[in-house]
A protein has these predicted regions:
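Short glycine/serine/threonine/alanine-rich loop segments
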Residues: 52, 89, 113, 166-167
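N-terminal amphipathic/basic-hydrophobic helices that include classical n-h-c signal peptides
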Residues: 1-17
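Catalytic core of membrane glycerolipid acyltransferases/transacylases, capturing the structured
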Residues: 59-119, 173-176, 185
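Membrane-anchoring hydrophobic helices of lipid-metabolizing enzymes
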Residues: 13-65, 69, 78-81, 105, ...
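Non-catalytic C-terminal accessory region of glycerolipid acyltransferases
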Residues: 14-34, 38, 121-215
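Residues at structural and domain junctions
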Residues: 3, 28-32, 66, 94, ...
Length: 215
């Protein structure tokens, strides 16, 4: 039986305001990307103008699967990409192949995007194997809801990837009321998909998305 942690959200959010500037210091050196200082500066500036902060640090783990939720708005993608740039983290993220259109494909791939064909999801596993084999540190991010709309059943691909790579799962919570991206707890899956999925969903139930009625 998994124990669901009790989150004292008031303490978490009180601590989050202590971080005024997003920095690559929140990321272990071997998990950082090779992006320019200008791109990082522009991303930090954009987050500051929008009023968003990033609290917490990415742990010193060689392989990490990031789970981001609640996903209820198109703004989640924009804020997420700005966060990746501002942290200068070498994070790969999974997106449906239809968004990788000409004109955007190069940008999304530069930002770490991996297109996945929903009719052939097994191809993602091959991509992950290739990346893990050639890179020292590997982080892949996914939104298990798979949609901005309210869904009952979350997708379990993140658990399969964690099992394939023997990775731990790191929670990225999007909390709209506080305008904070919280880099939260790290979780080692048990191998019981239903119990693990229940644990993850309960963790994120403490947070509210931009459109809370869709979560």
């Amino acid at each position: 039986m998994l124990r669901i942690p009790h989150l004292n959200l008031s303490i978490i959010l009180k601590e989050s305001v202590m971080i005024k500037e997003v920095s690559q210091k929140q990321v272990p050196s071997y998990l950082r990307a090779r992006r320019s200082k200008l791109s990082r500066y522009l991303a930090r500036t954009a987050l500051r103008i929008l009023g968003w902060e990033v609290s917490g640090n990415i742990p010193d783990e060689e392989i990490i699967v990031v789970v981001a939720a609640p996903h209820t708005s198109n703004w989640d993608f924009i804020i997420g990409m700005l966060t990746i740039l501002a942290l200068n983290v070498n994070l790969k993220w999974v997106g449906k192949s239809s968004i990788f259109k000409p004109g955007f494909k190069w940008l999304f791939k530069w930002l770490g995007g991996i297109p996945v064909d929903r009719n052939n999801p097994s191809s993602l596993m091959e991509d992950v194997k290739d990346i893990v084999a050639r890179e020292k540190g590997f982080i892949i991010g996914m939104a298990p809801e798979g949609s901005r709309k309210k869904v009952i059943r979350w997708k379990t691909g993140f658990l399969r990837i964690a099992e394939l790579t023997q990775a731990k799962i790191l929670f990225f919570a999007i909390d709209a009321p506080s305008k904070c991206i919280l880099i939260g707890d790290i979780f080692k899956p048990t191998g019981n998909v239903e119990e693990d999925l229940k644990f993850v969903k309960n963790y994120f139930s403490a947070f509210k998305g931009i459109n809370p009625d869709q979560f």
